Structure formats: C-alpha cells, structure tokens
From Swiss-Prot:
Xref: PROSITE patterns: PPIC_PPIASE_1, PPIC_PPIASE_2, PROKAR_LIPOPROTEIN
Protein name: Foldase protein PrsA
Species this chain originates from: Caldanaerobacter subterraneus subsp. tengcongensis (strain DSM 15242 / JCM 11007 / NBRC 100824 / MB4) (Thermoanaerobacter tengcongensis)
Residue numbers with lipid attached (N-palmitoyl cysteine): C21
Domain PpiC: residue ranges: 165-255
Enzyme class per UniProt: isomerase
Amino acid sequence: MRRKIALFLALIFVGVSLVSCSSKKEAVSGDVVAVVNGEKITNAEYQQIFEQVKEQIESAPTYTKDIWNQDYQGKKFLDFVKENVLDSLVAQKLLVQEAKKKNITVTDKEVEEEYNKEKQFNSKVTKEQIREYLLIDKLLAEYTKDVKVTDEELKKYYDEHKESFEVMRARHILVADEKTAEDIYQRLMKGEDFAALAKEYSIDTATKDNGGDLGEFPHGVMVPEFEEAAFSLKLGEISKPVKTQYGYHIIKSEGITVKPFDEVKGTIESYLLNDKKNKVIKEKYDELVKASKIQKFPENIKVKVG
C-alpha cells in the first residue's frame, strides 16, 4: 500500500502539479490552507504531513540545514516542499472523497495491520492517515483493475529496446595518472598480456588480482564515461585511457550479449503495467479535478525548519 500511494504522490512531488484551482477565492479563516469541494484542510492537518516529509528529508545522509534555502527548480527548496505538500494534501482529500462516493470502505483490522507496518518507516503517521491511504489504495486498484499487458506488447518493447538488455563482460586497468595509463596502453598495443599488467599496475583492489576482470554488467551501472567507452568496444578491443572520477581506465571488451526475452519478460511486464496504470490514474484524477471546486490558500501555511 505504502509504495502505491508513494507512486501516485510522486506524480505531484516531482513538480508536475495535478491540481487546478478556482480563480475566485472565498473568504476563509487564517487556519485553512485549502478547501476541496467544501471540505477544509486546516493548517494543523498540513503541519502533520509537513513534519513527516521534513523528518524524511532531514534523515537523509546528505542533509544539511542550508538545504531549505537552496535553489530548486527555480525557487527555494522550502517553498517547493511547501507547495507540493499542499498539492498532495489536496489530492488525498479529493481521492478520499471519491472513494467514499463509491462506497469503498476500510476495516479497523486493515488499518491496524497497515499502521503497524508503516510506523516502522514513519514514526509520526496516524491511524486516520492510514485509513485515508487505504481508501485511496482501494480506489486506485478499482481504477486499474482491468489494465493488462499483452504478449505482443511485451515482445514489441523488447525488440525496440534491446540495447537496454545488453550485458557486457570486460576487464580494466585503473591507474591514478594519465602518463602511467598511456605507458600501459602502449605496452598493450605491442602485445603484452592485459591480465598480467592489471595485476601489476591496477589500483582497483577489487579486481586487480583477477586480472582486472569486472564480470558482467548492464547499462546504467558504471559511471557514464566508463560505460560509453566500454559499450563502444568490439570483442577483444582495448580502449585508450578513459578519465573518470576514479582515475584513468584502460578497458578491454570480452563481449556483449543481450539477455533473452524470457529472462527479462517479467521486468518488462512490471514496467509496462505500472506505466499503463499511472496513465489511467492520471486521467481519472484529471477528470476529478475538472469536476471539483478546489481553492488553495498557501499564505496561511505556517511551518518551521532548520
């Protein structure tokens, strides 16, 4: 459940706002941050969610206090988070309203079970939030229950994206400076043994004793400079020195293979199914927005950070 809701809210949180607002605002008290079809979202409700998001941000290994004032997508990161928390709350309210209209229900037992799981990841989550998340989850499941992917679609995707399923086997010699790399490259061009030179000179302690053998790796694993050079090599070909953040690499290709369709069919199916479901959910959500009266009052948001 947690992952499904996160996926939906990610549509909002990546900065793609799914919420449109009524241009004519009605007067509300200073404690109201939004009104969705007549239902108010208070600053207290907003604070609950904001604190949970803040806790997750501040628990990240790269967190520093000045992050809130840093520029992100053309605005202060704090303003970005505030706007997107508000949009996510509006989205939740709208979806819960729709779930209730469809007479979707959640039992106390379901809430208790999910709450016990969720609180391990989010210490500030409440049972009422869990109840709403479960209602949304069931609504999204209802929206997407008939979504399927055919074998023809799976095969077509595989045939059109075979490069994505390439797996390379290679060796490399990593050294710290360009001159050493050039010297080793020239010796290789004269026919010296790659594995022997890797054992003698490579500073990659994880592979040097195996003659620089990196084993198999797909696209997206190595740093970009290394990957581009490696996958451009023909079988047995040796690259000129390639500079990366780690130093200078000399790479030898030991061949590229493509994973067979049957091996990657499940991965493709999951990807295409999720893609189709997300499109259906977005279409349904856009319809809800158009049929709703939504007002936001960001000026009433009160939060503290740092």
